[in-house]
Amino acid sequence: MKFYTRSEWGAAPPSDDLSPASNGGQGTVHYSASRITARAKNMPKPEKPGEKWYRLWRNKATPAVQRRNISRAITDYNRKIALWKKMGGEVPPALVENEKAIVRGFQAFHQGPSRGWLDIAYHRIIFATGNIYEGRPLGTTGAHAVGANHTTGYCFVMGEGDEPTGQMIDSFHEQRVKDGVRHYVGHRQRPGNSTSCPGAALTAALDL
């Protein structure tokens, strides 16, 4: 596992001051609901041939474009993950760059006109490699669960039908201890949140 700070993945600053919050030893588990197993043929093509779409999140601000860009980035990430699992060894730099691009995409979407939040919703973003990315600073209020935004929000980049990797699970437990989180539940277990998040597979893997 490697932990990447906001400066390392290229975070934009919050649009306003974030409210302080104590997690009280509590965490809330989410998934991105973006299938990392999505087939490339089902994804829209880049608007310009050969264009690096994951560099355009800040310039293409409409919610529909942001969603398409995130889907493309996750599809590209899935190809690299499949190869990495076959090859083994260290996580290649290209895979890390994909992860950073996806996190930037999440932040751009969350701060954009569709959501209008001050910053990325979650405090921690976890990938199949076990790498974790700093989202909102710990000790600030998130935007991830009604009535529970004071808790530390963990987002696993996976969707319904995906199985979390062992690296994901191990990294989550290692990080939550560092974050002072002793008790955690799934998003759907928080009162007032009508959702299937974080999905059946992650719910089972974490015994939620």
Write out the residue ranges for each language-model feature.
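Basic/polar, cationic surfaces and motifs that engage anionic cell-wall
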Residues: 1-90, 115-121, 127-208
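Short Gly/aromatic-enriched secondary-structure transition segments
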Residues: 42-49, 98-107
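Alpha-helix N-cap and loop-to-helix initiation/capping positions
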Residues: 94-98, 163-164
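Active-site-adjacent structural elements in enzyme catalytic domains
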Residues: 104-108, 174-177
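Gly/Ser-rich "nucleophile elbow"/oxyanion-hole loop immediately N-terminal to the catalytic nucleophile
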Residues: 112
